[in-house]
Amino acid sequence: MELETHLSKYFTLAFTHKSMSLEMREKLAINSSTTLKEFLQTIKTHCPNIKECMVLSTCNRFEIYASLKHGANTNEQKNALLKILAQNKKMSVSDLEKCVLMNTDESAVHHVFSVCSSLDSLVVGETQITGQMKNAYKFAFEEKFCSKDLTRLLHFAFKCAAKVRNLTGISKQGVSISSVAVKEALNIFEKERIKDKKALVIGLGEMAQLVIKHLLNKQFEVLILGRNAAKFEDFVKELEEPKKVSFQNIENLNAYINEYELLFCATSSPHFIVQNRMLKETIFRRFWFDLAVPRNIEKPVLDNIFLYSVDDLEPMVRENVENRQESRTKAYEIVGLATMEFYQWIQSLEVEPVIKDLRELARISAQKELQKALKKRYVPKEYESNIEKILHNAFNTFLHHPTIALKKNAQKEESDVLVGAIKNLFNLDKSTTCHAQNLNLYKCEYYEE
């Protein structure tokens, strides 16, 4: 009988800024926890061969990470997911097919590690993506759409990302979409000789907060338009120059939209926040940065408003990529090594329970025979403790070489066959040994840096 492998079959589907237009990414974007939960539940209901699943949705990518049941056909899972996406997002399967990138097994693991390490980002080295992945994993885990398999994968991905940051310095310049946007705004400020160094920011989410911090660092005064005054108060406590930032409810947008030359918009709204009906003619030119996906700013009809989207910033990012080529090469070497180490780690996790089961089986057998001997008075009761120690040392000595051999072979491809044979020979799958203590091996500290 063929032995079933216990190694997880990993699978990813990715739609990114490299393969899909901003217009199409807007349709795929999920900005609500309710919508995300419904989407994951749809996958769980209609894709029985998908064991675990999570979704990463950002301004530059929409990705599905999954582990599949043994024997599942990856192309069938891909087609099923594309069909669900097409129905859910009112898109055609053929359009999605043209843009999707599928990875399985080692290439899927390598892809997840690369994304988490910011090597696949529009701005290579930006650190925001790691936090976004942690949030995506946390949500899927807490809603019970993922457990052991994806926890193992993401646990290692976060370690890999930290290693890339620490060993390559790829993130030292602190470049991100928000910083690139502010840098471009600063160039515009100087070229246009704008008199007042002030900016309007709509939103108070993660992206908006990064924009605000970069603007304050460049000595701008910032007016924030948002919905949550309490959130603003908490945010202000983090700032070095809180006096340079003020807050108004977004309901007052009409009062301020025509007063600022520089505007940044980054909210999770699925609709346009800034609409043409709000606009009035001004004597000055205006430069607006829409950093949201879906976009928050309707394409302006006035000639003196210049609008930059996330994709418009790509040419400004190329210089950053070229400057970091050496760090990027080293980072990919780390990711490649981490992918190999991940599978070695996974295989060792499969071996450890077998070793513990063997030792527990030996202990139970020795204890059983000792109790028989005591009951039949083959040995005096006062010798019980010493005999237990002798038996413990004996089965430790007996299992020493098999333990070393198992750990050594855990990193080899034949590990599954060896582990399966031992389980079959010693009937370990049917033993009463409890594996609950091993659950800590799968714990993922997603909240740690």
UniProtKB/Swiss-Prot annotation:
Annotated residues that bind substrate are located at T58, C59, N60, R61, S121, E126, T127, Q128, Q132
Work out whether the entry's keyword set contains Transmembrane: no
Q: Supply the Gene3D superfamilies for this chain.
A: Glutamyl-tRNA reductase, N-terminal domain, NAD(P)-binding Rossmann-like Domain
- Which positions in this protein are listed as binding NADP(+)? G203, L204, G205, E206, M207, A208
Family indicated by similarity: Belongs to the glutamyl-tRNA reductase family.
**Other observations noted:** During catalysis, the active site Cys acts as a nucleophile attacking the alpha-carbonyl group of tRNA-bound glutamate with the formation of a thioester intermediate between enzyme and glutamate, and the concomitant release of tRNA(Glu). The thioester intermediate is finally reduced by direct hydride transfer from NADPH, to form the product GSA.
Q: What name does UniProt use for this protein? A: Glutamyl-tRNA reductase
Species the sequence originates in = Helicobacter pylori (strain P12)
> What does UniProt list as this organism's lineage?
Bacteria, Pseudomonadati, Campylobacterota, Epsilonproteobacteria, Campylobacterales
